[in-house]
Swiss-Prot record:
Signal peptide: none annotated. Keywords: Cell inner membrane, Cell membrane, Membrane, Transmembrane, Transmembrane helix. It comes from the Bacteria. The chain crosses the membrane at residues 46-66, 69-89. This is UPF0208 membrane protein YPO2564/y1623/YP_2375. Its main location: membrane. It holds the Pfam family DUF412. NCBIfam families: PRK01816.1. GO terms for cellular component: plasma membrane. HAMAP family: UPF0208. InterPro entries: UPF0208 (IPR007334). It is found in: Cell inner membrane. It is a multi-pass membrane protein. It comes from Yersinia pestis.
Length: 151
């Protein structure tokens, strides 16, 4: 049974949480086969960087060549909307509760941090992907790189 993310979060907060999740998620190659976050993060960062200038270029180019204003604006809005879709997906993913298989893995990584003598924050009632990202980021910083091999 999949629990749906909280519906009380506004669309702006979802985008903010997506940006925070994108910054928090560790960009480690060993996580890429299991989690799509690495690919979504790379594409979203690319879109944030290059789509607004592309939108301005296509808008001015179509207007300068005598094109109609409607399609030019639609193209520019589409180009600017692509990175927003990535942030929206990441924001929704950040507030989604972990499935049972990942929940067990979450507790194992948390236990490894505890065994290493690191102070661990109390667990939320229902851990989310954001709490997994925070835990993994901390584990990659404070544990040796082979901690994933043992799990």
């Amino acid at each position: 049974m999949t629990i749906k993310p909280s519906d009380s979060v506004s669309w702006f907060q979802v985008l903010q949480r997506g940006q925070h999740y994108m910054k928090t998620w560790p960009a480690d190659k060993r996580l890429a086969p299991v989690f799509p976050e690495n690919r979504v993060t790379v594409v979203t960062r690319f879109g944030i960087r290059f789509m607004p200038p592309l939108a301005i270029f296509t808008l001015t180019w179509q207007i300068a060549l005598g094109g109609q204003l409607g399609p030019a604006i639609a193209t520019a809005l589409f180009a600017c909307g692509l990175p927003l879709q990535g942030l929206w997906w990441l924001g929704k993913r950040a507030i989604t509760p972990l499935p049972p298989t990942l929940l067990q893995w979450f507790h194992e990584v948390r236990h490894k941090l505890f065994e290493a003598g690191q102070a661990v924050a109390p667990i939320e009632p229902i851990p989310t992907y954001q709490s997994l990202a925070d835990l993994l980021k901390r584990a990659f910083k404070q544990l040796d790189k082979t901690f994933l091999d043992d799990l």
